């Protein structure tokens, strides 16, 4: 009898345990997994946005939905698949097969539009869950993509460009907003960037070039206004393009600068008074350096140094460069920072500049025509700027400042410079010669009648390891300053291995430089006033009922709302107090006199 009771007790206990397990399983499937979705996203930080100098969003984070499936809770996989298919852009057969194949919870499709996620939830399908995720979006596609970079599907996992370099700042919450990272503001001007990419990309396609690179930099601050690299890619679909497209060739491409190097040799000659102003050098059309015969495009006859630059005379610059002692030339080239990284971005190439102990009697002669030395595009632009800005070697920079979600500046980047002792006389001589290059020399295809450009063409054969210089492989470039009388901008256009009959810097790169300058003159000339100008390419948001330059009514708005409304206009804002806006200067509908808007909150 006792044994019978014991067996009943054991059986009853077993049934109770089994019942509790079943109840627990139901509770888990019904509630716990849903809670897991919330916990998974509850502590996520929204990645900060990346803006150009106008406030145009180059990278932003938006809410998205990810659809998850609990196969054990789905009683009719076919019905569920048919219901989901139209929203997920997937064949129902494929969805059904995946559901039947899986046994544990899985993600069916990630980062779909949030509105689609809401519609799927309205279907009330058993076993279908929605997870909230953040999605990184690049609203203007490939605009500045090689510079900005991209993130993976998880937006906290940066993969390239500025997204990687400033990943920590973009993902670290600020004191004013614990849910969002800092915003990154660039020196890039989206309108100038667009014009550069449009002109450069068109010629890149037409010539079938291996690469095309364009840079525009403020000559007095080192701020990069535009930087383009082709082949390009859309960071929204980065998996559809190769690594060559993802690379920022403005800092990675290493090449021999060719005749653009002549301005640096001429700068040394002028700066050290190593030749007389009226001194001339004879060019019979070639010069022999040992067993090597270097040709000129023509037998130029007798030329002074300015004319040597004007006609890009190889023989003339080689003969003139022999006046420079090797140690002095070496010191100047190091001041120009050849063979060194500029400090612009971390993965920058250094180029190559031979140590003095490896120099031969011919080293300086080949260097005069841009051979035996290699540079990056950003390096050449920075070095050239120092010739035209009075000897200030600037560190190029593309980041202006960080801000919080209310627009308050958290950290501002300053101009870094090193004086290298270029005299005003030297600058005047070089700019005068380079202006003549464009007016009547090898760079005449960059000439604009109403606007002066100073420039230097570069055409060089490419060398391949073990084979030397190869016929048919060329590098074509144009280095320019504008306006020539008092330069504000230095720029470089470069084509690597162009195909077809035109491969010279004057024939290929100079016309592109001209097109870019013509298109951006209104932007450069009007300065800050153009921050209210936008292209159709950028018209994502509009201020309804607000004329360009007029201030909208912001009374009653929060700081975030005011910032969002004013962002497309690029108007600088100064916040006073906290809470909601009760006063603004200037008043709604009026224009700012000093370009700044003061908002008062309480």
Task: Name these PLM-found stretches.
Residues 101-106, 138-141, 351-356, 450-457, ...:
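Amphipathic alpha-helical surface "interface" segments used
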Residues 254, 537-582, 587-602:
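Extracytoplasmic Gram-positive cell-surface binding/anchoring modules and repeats
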Residues 409-415, 507-551:
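Short, gly/Ser/Thr-rich active-site loops of penicillin-recognizing serine hydrolases
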Residues 144-148, 223, 263-264, 381-382, ...:
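Short, solvent-exposed alpha-helical surface patches in non-cytosolic proteins
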Residues 1-238, 249, 254, 325-337, ...:
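Periplasmic/cell-envelope proteins involved in peptidoglycan metabolism and beta-lactam response
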Residues 57-59, 214, 218-259, 264-495, ...:
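Beta-lactam-recognizing serine transpeptidase/beta-lactamase-like catalytic domain environment
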